[in-house]
A protein has these predicted regions:
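H-loop/switch region of ABC-family ATPase nucleotide-binding domains
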Residues: 140-141
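Catalytic Walker B motif of ABC-type/P-loop ATPase nucleotide-binding domains
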Residues: 104-108
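Conserved catalytic motifs of ABC-family nucleotide-binding domains
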Residues: 100
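Conserved ABC ATPase signature
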Residues: 79-83, 87
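Conserved ABC ATPase "signature" region
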Residues: 60-75
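ABC ATPase nucleotide-binding domains
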Residues: 171, 178-221
Length: 221
């Protein structure tokens, strides 16, 4: 905590402006954002359908399609105040994906969700990665998920300590100083869920062949 993860997400989306340096985005880049916290006046009546239109004008069919894509179709008329933690997060995913983003920024997307809900939401992230062309920047402090479900890791501690493939990062001196040998040895047993392996230079080997790898990108801060 306090390493700059959420600040990085907000700088990426433009929610915050840098006080020094600069952030460059491709012109016309569409960004979907699932914040760590969303401030809502819970005393006001608010349906999921209405929440989906607070930041843009979308048709009923667009809203229905976005909710369907994240497994939340039945919630479109539900009161936001009555949603479980996992249901609310799915709605936030739908709210982010309705813009058909080029880049999806997820800031601790499973915070406040129970274990089974976490598993389901990480499966949803994997589904989005595999079925859309969106790049994904996921902010997380869960090292097991970071190492098992990513292509590129960026490790922050007030600055960029190290970056690269999971296998390269967990061997880096900066990572070992930050988390210790015990963490590195524990994480060494993780199983990557892709049907390929990453070389340290980012090249991918699958079924005995090396090829360039691009499924929209998937990075962790």
């Amino acid at each position: 905590n306090g390493s700059g993860k959420s600040t990085t997400a907000k700088l990426t989306t433009g929610v915050l402006k840098p006080t020094t340096g600069s952030v460059t985005r491709k012109p016309g880049l569409r960004i979907g954002y699932v914040p760590q916290k969303l401030t809502i006046d819970w005393t006001l009546p608010l349906t999921v359908e209405r929440l989906m239109t607070l930041t843009g004008r979308y048709s009923a069919s667009e809203i229905a399609a976005a909710l369907e894509a994240v497994g939340a179709a039945r919630l479109h008329k539900a009161a936001v105040q009555e949603l479980s933690g996992g249901e609310f997060q799915r709605v936030l995913f739908a709210r982010a994906m309705i813009r058909k983003p080029d880049l999806l920024v997820l800031d601790e997307p499973v915070q406040g969700v129970d274990f089974s809900g976490e598993v389901a939401l990480y499966e949803l992230v994997r589904q989005i990665r595999d079925t859309t062309q969106s790049g994904i920047l996921m902010i997380s402090h869960d090292l097991h998920v970071v190492m098992a479900e990513t292509d590129t890791v960026i490790c922050l501690n007030g600055h960029v300590c190290c970056r690269g493939t999971p296998s390269a990062v967990k061997r880096s001196p900066e990572y070992l100083r930050l988390f210790g040998e015990r963490a590195a040895s524990t994480l060494a047993i993780y199983q990557h869920h892709h049907d390929h392996e990453h070389h340290d230079d980012g090249c991918v080997v699958a079924e005995g062949h090396a090829h360039e790898h691009d499924h929209g990108g998937h990075s962790h801060g």
